[in-house]
């Protein structure tokens, strides 16, 4: 709204000035002018007392234009009057005021004002504001209205706050009026003006006088500095922190070009840089330059890279190192740069200025305050490497593209990441090596990878990419990102190939394969019980000791554990055959003491004609165990023919192992989940003895059937076993095994194995239904 009001006010003030200039020749009495003007100003002051300072110029502009009309010549207020118009009005009022005052011929200061750069800068700045989106940070942070009005308000505030010194300004103005008034003009005009000012509204008039005097004392220092500050975008430094983005960009190249002796090829570039005189114009051009010159710069750079690569190849094929030109080049390079980067310009002399040589050698930012980029935040700067490339190629069109040390000092992340001050000459030397490799093959001592694995003959695992491709393309330049890219790719290839070769050369670590345990079979554990049984449970475990011709085996049933344990005397003839599926209840489960059943103890003396032996036969697949009591004579317990499955000391069966401790298998008890027991009619050895078996009628722990063991020599001691008598009964959940207390006295074997068992029914978990039906045999 304020800007709109200002524009409408400008139009109205220009119209008023036209009207007053037209009406002024009709007035003849100069003495009446102050009074009439005073009345006009009082009227305007009364109308616009509540308005902004811009609206107070309604009475100001026609007044002073009329005062500048007398014949005696221009009054000293003429120039200041127009300055006030220029100060309080925008650009639209200035041409109108100049055209309005031109016919009178009295506006002396108008020509000087029209040529002042301050107004143009201010005007260009206001026209320059809509182009701000070229600078993203500034465009986002500062709205357009804020830019166009804030500084102007500050200007008006600084200028109009001088009304405190009203009397001093009036006195100085009157003194200057007396000194500067021509001879034809009486000095009474100054006094009349003072009296008019006293008679008028002192606030508005003294404000006008103070403004005019302020501008007259410091003519354009404040305004030019202010306009230059605004137009050159230095004000952005205080507002957004992005200062000196474009303003100094037009001046820095000219300063650099003045430092050293300029070559004729550099002079037109310097003139081009100096052409934008006004900071606003220069800033506008700098804003437009990225969009206009981006594609053309890249195309020129690409062509120059190709030309320089071809030129460098031709130079490398010739004896350029032995030529006097090459020696002079080396000497001058040592003198100018003072660095170790000798192969920067192998085909031509260094640039004629120390500035160019210092820039080309890639010295850090702190060492070159003049060549420092003006863009601190990654914005486009005036002398980007693209423009520098144009200058160098214009100086020597066939030179290698070694003048591109880095993109800029303001955002080269790869350069900052991989930059190492100790390896400054790596970039240009890498270019020469690439070109020389494309011509004469790879160098012998050149490491092809940054991280090469020493694995014998395959040291250089990752060969460098084709140098012919590199030398002909964009990667031929000294762009640091190219080196980083090559290093990264080469390193990845080297690491990958190194790992592959290492894995190929190193035999695979043979993981310790678990011993080929037999397939899951009934448990047969091979060690002595570590501790005696629980004293609360009277079971001591049925221990049967038999001394055969070759071996002595002892089988123990620790009641506190779920697995049977066996100990072999001379050989480890028993192997643990256990199918462990994570459930410890696969074995015989001992109930509590209250549920135990006490069985009668039968003692057989040595003189009796019968003895009792418990023989367990394991089938070929070791899934059926038959426990039978065999009765034999005192002199002959049994023969190897009676044993159906005695085939050796340790015979591996289908899924387990069968035990044959000598001629007779005694006391081998297997921890199984299901047992199949043959009844009397199905017993394969019925002729030698009667095996009496019972199946419990009820599944309670206290209900078991038992048969008293006869004392006849041909009768066997009964062993009550609760098991599934047929495969159809394998689905039973609770099976009980009753082991009587046995005292075995084999007459043929020396030691007497005493077995006392306070037997308790032991619960057996059923076998899975898919297992093969068990087989058992009773041997006498």
From Swiss-Prot:
Transmembrane residue ranges: none
Q: Name one Pfam family in it.
A: AMER
- Biased composition, class Basic and acidic residues, residue ranges: 20-32
Q: Which UniProt keywords apply?
A: Cell membrane, Lipid-binding, Membrane, Wnt signaling pathway
Residues annotated as region Disordered? 20-59, 341-407, 547-569, 582-617, 635-659, 706-729, 749-780
Where found, per UniProt? Cell membrane
Record flagged with keyword Methyltransferase: no
Family the entry assigns? Belongs to the Amer family.
Relate the protein's function as given in its record: Regulator of the canonical Wnt signaling pathway. Acts by specifically binding phosphatidylinositol 4,5-bisphosphate (PtdIns(4,5)P2), translocating to the cell membrane.
Protein name listed in UniProt: APC membrane recruitment protein 3
- Organism expressing this protein natively: Mus musculus
Q: Gene encoding it?
A: Amer3
């Amino acid at each position: 709204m304020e800007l709109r009001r200002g524009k409408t006010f400008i139009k109205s003030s220009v119209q008023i000035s036209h009207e007053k200039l037209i009406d002024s020749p009709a007035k003849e009495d100069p003495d009446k002018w102050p009074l009439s003007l005073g009345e006009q100003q009082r009227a305007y002051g009364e109308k616009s007392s509540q308005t902004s300072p811009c609206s107070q110029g309604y009475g100001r502009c026609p007044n002073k234009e009329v005062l500048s009309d007398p014949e005696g010549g221009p009054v000293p207020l003429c120039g200041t009057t127009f300055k006030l118009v220029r100060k309080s009005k925008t650009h639209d009022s200035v041409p109108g005021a100049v055209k309005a005052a031109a016919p009178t011929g009295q506006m002396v200061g108008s020509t000087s004002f029209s040529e002042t750069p301050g107004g143009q800068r201010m005007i260009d700045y206001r026209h320059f504001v809509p182009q701000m989106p070229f600078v993203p940070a500034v465009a986002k942070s500062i709205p357009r209205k804020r830019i166009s009005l804030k500084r102007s308000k500050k200007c008006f505030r600084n200028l109009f706050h001088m009304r405190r010194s009203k009397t001093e300004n009036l006195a100085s103005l009157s003194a200057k009026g007396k000194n500067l008034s021509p001879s034809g003009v009486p000095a009474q005009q100054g006094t009349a003006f003072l009296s008019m000012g006293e008679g008028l509204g002192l606030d508005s008039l003294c404000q006008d006088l103070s403004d005019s005097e302020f501008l007259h004392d410091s003519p354009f220092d404040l305004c030019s500095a202010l306009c230059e500050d605004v137009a050159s975008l230095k004000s952005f430094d205080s507002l957004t922190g992005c200062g000196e983005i474009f303003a100094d960009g037009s001046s820095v190249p000219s300063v650099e070009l003045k430092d050293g002796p300029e070559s004729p090829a550099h002079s037109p570039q310097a003139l081009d840089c100096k052409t934008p005189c006004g900071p606003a114009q220069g800033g506008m051009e700098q804003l437009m330059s990225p969009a206009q010159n981006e594609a053309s710069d890249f195309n020129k750079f690409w062509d120059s890279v190709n030309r320089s690569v071809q030129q460098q190849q031709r130079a490398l094929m010739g004896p350029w190192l032995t030529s006097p030109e090459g020696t002079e080049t080396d000497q001058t390079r040592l003198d100018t740069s003072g660095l170790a980067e000798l192969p920067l310009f192998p085909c031509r002399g260094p640039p004629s200025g120390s500035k160019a040589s210092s820039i080309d050698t890639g010295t850090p930012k702190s060492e070159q305050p003049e060549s420092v980029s003006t863009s601190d935040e990654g914005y486009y700067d005036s002398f980007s490497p693209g423009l520098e490339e144009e200058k160098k190629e214009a100086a020597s069109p066939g030179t290698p593209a070694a003048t591109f040390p880095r993109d800029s000092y303001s955002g080269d992340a790869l350069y900052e990441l991989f930059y190492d001050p100790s390896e400054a000459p790596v970039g240009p030397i890498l270019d020469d090596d690439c070109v020389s490799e494309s011509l004469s093959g790879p160098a012998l001592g050149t490491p092809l990878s940054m991280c090469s694995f020493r694995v014998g003959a395959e040291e250089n695992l990752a060969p460098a990419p084709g140098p012919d491709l590199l030398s002909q393309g964009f990667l031929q330049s000294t762009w640091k990102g190219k080196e980083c890219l090559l290093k990264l790719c080469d390193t990845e290839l080297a690491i990958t190939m190194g790992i592959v070769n290492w894995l190929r050369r190193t035999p695979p670590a043979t993981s310790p394969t678990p011993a080929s345990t037999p397939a899951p079979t009934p448990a047969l554990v091979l060690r002595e019980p570590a501790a005696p049984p629980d004293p609360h449970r009277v079971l001591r475990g049925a221990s049967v000791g038999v001394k055969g011709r070759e071996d002595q085996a002892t089988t123990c049933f620790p009641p506190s554990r779920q697995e049977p344990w066996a100990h072999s005397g001379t050989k480890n003839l028993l192997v643990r055959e256990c199918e462990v599926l994570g459930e410890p209840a696969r074995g015989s489960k001992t109930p509590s003491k209250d549920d135990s059943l006490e069985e009668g103890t039968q003692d057989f003396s040595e003189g009796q004609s019968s003895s009792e032996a418990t023989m367990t036969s394991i089938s070929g697949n070791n899934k059926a165990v038959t426990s039978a009591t065999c009765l034999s004579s005192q002199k002959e317990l049994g023969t190897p023919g009676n044993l159906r499955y005695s085939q050796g000391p340790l015979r591996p069966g289908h899924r387990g192992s069968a035990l044959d401790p000598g001629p007779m298998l005694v006391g081998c008890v297997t921890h199984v989940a299901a047992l199949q027991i043959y009844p009397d009619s199905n017993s394969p050895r019925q002729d030698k003895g009667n095996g009496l078996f019972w199946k419990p009628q009820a599944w309670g722990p206290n209900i078991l059937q038992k048969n008293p063991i006869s004392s006849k020599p041909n009768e066997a001691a009964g062993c009550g076993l609760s098991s599934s008598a047929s495969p159809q009964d394998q689905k039973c959940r609770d099976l009980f095994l009753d082991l009587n207390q046995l005292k075995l006295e084999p007459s043929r074997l020396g030691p007497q194995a005493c077995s006392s068992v306070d037997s308790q029914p032991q619960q057996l978990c059923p076998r899975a239904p898919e297992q093969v039906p068990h087989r058992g045999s009773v041997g006498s």
